[in-house]
């Protein structure tokens, strides 16, 4: 999930701030959260809320990376930013 996997791609002392809603969250995840009575934050650790892969790169390269991925037929979104505070924060 987010809390274990994303920090592994970052340098020591870094974390990530994820902006919820910056990608399409499929209805199945809302269904599972509601009817499975799963805490909202826990959904990010169990199901990644539909995120299949995270790539961390310099902010100035983000738009180009999204364009390249979309050029290959992939859905891509900028979902957050790297911070100088360890851990994963979801806003």
Model-derived regions: residue spans:
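Glycine-/charge-enriched secondary-structure boundary and capping motifs
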Residues: 1-91
């Amino acid at each position: 999930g987010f809390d274990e996997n994303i920090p592994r791609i970052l340098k020591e002392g870094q974390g990530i701030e994820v902006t919820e809603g910056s990608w399409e969250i499929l209805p199945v995840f809302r269904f599972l959260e509601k009817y499975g009575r799963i805490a909202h934050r826990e959904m990010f650790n169990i199901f990644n809320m539909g995120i299949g892969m995270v790539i961390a790169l310099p902010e100035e390269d983000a738009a180009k990376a999204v364009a390249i991925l979309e050029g290959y037929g992939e859905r891509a979104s900028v979902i957050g930013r790297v911070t100088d505070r360890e851990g994963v924060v979801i806003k």
